[in-house]
């Protein structure tokens, strides 16, 4: 049958609101151009009427101007109607798009809720509490280990009063050690002879030095 009558052509999709808006706007632009041409004719007729005297010729020009003005008013009405149609379709298109966006948002929210429920099923509060307890126990064990490592060995406990008494006594001992006995010893030491020592003799008539020892004669 397809060979005899041919295959039916697929139906074209119906025009969308965006396509209709484009078509209406194009028609409105075409009408605007016509109105502009009519405005130019009206200006020309108006100049002619100003320069002409009253009479049949002037009346004929006026009739032409009135016909052009009437066409202009009709085109303006058509343009206004098309503008209103375009506005209405744009509002409808905006509403449709808003509804589509709303549906997309709702679908995304539903999917999010579904994923959240799925995730919550995988998380159990008992496991979280057990994990917290394990962490707390591990922290306590770590603190005990630190205390054990920092513990001192063989250190007797000392009384604070005994330490203070020892400190006071230590101060007295330091003051006692800082005496001036070494100054007395220095004062009793033999004085350093001043000037050149003179020759002296002992009881046997032998020359002796300043220390009382016999002098060795120079060779």
From Swiss-Prot:
GO biological process annotations for this chain's record? autophagosome maturation; autophagy; cellular response to lipopolysaccharide; cellular response to muramyl dipeptide; erythrocyte differentiation; ESCRT III complex disassembly; late endosome to lysosome transport; late endosome to vacuole transport via multivesicular body sorting pathway
A Gene Ontology cellular-component term: autophagosome membrane
Domain of life, per the record?
A: Eukaryota
The listed outcome for residue 7 to R is: Decreased stearoylation in response to S.flexneri infection
Name the Gene3D superfamilies on file. 6.10.140.1230
Q: Which InterPro entries match?
A: Snf7_fam (IPR005024)
Signal peptide range: none
> Would I find Protein transport among this entry's keywords?
yes
Q: PTM Phosphoserine: list the residues.
A: 86
Start and end residues of each stretch annotated as Interaction with VTA1: 121-158
Residues of the region (Disordered) are 1-21, 188-219
Protein keywords:
Coiled coil, Cytoplasm, Endosome, Lipoprotein, Membrane, Phosphoprotein, Protein transport, Transport, Ubl conjugation
Please report which protein family the annotation says this sequence is part of.
Answer: Belongs to the SNF7 family.
Q: What quaternary arrangement does the UniProt entry report?
A: Probable peripherally associated component of the endosomal sorting required for transport complex III (ESCRT-III). ESCRT-III components are thought to multimerize to form a flat lattice on the perimeter membrane of the endosome. Several assembly forms of ESCRT-III may exist that interact and act sequentially. Interacts with VTA1; the interaction involves soluble CHMP5. Interacts with CHMP2A. Interacts with NOD2. Interacts with BROX.
Q: What is this protein called?
A: Charged multivesicular body protein 5
Originating species: Homo sapiens (Human)
- What gene, per UniProt, encodes this protein? CHMP5
């Amino acid at each position: 049958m397809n060979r005899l009558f041919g295959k039916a052509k697929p139906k074209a999709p119906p025009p969308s609101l965006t396509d209709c808006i484009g078509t209406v706007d194009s028609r409105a632009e075409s009408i605007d151009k016509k109105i502009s041409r009519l405005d130019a004719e009206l200006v020309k007729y108006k100049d002619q009427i100003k320069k002409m005297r009253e009479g049949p010729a002037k009346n004929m020009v006026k009739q032409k101007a009135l016909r052009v003005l009437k066409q202009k008013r009709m085109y303006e009405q058509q343009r206004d109607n098309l503008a209103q149609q375009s506005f209405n379709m744009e509002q409808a298109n905006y509403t449709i798009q808003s509804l589509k966006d709303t549906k997309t948002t709702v679908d995304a929210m539903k999917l999010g809720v579904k994923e959240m429920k799925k995730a919550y099923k995988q998380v159990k509060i008992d496991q979280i509490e057990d994990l917290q307890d394990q962490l707390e126990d591990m922290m306590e064990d770590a603190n005990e280990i630190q205390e054990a490592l920092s513990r001192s060995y063989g250190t007797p406990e000392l009384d604070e009063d005994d330490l203070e008494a020892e400190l006071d006594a230590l101060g007295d001992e330091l003051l006692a050690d800082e005496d001036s006995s070494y100054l007395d010893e220095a004062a009793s030491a033999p004085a350093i002879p001043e000037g050149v020592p003179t020759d002296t003799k002992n009881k046997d008539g032998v020359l002796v030095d300043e220390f009382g020892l016999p002098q060795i004669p120079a060779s």
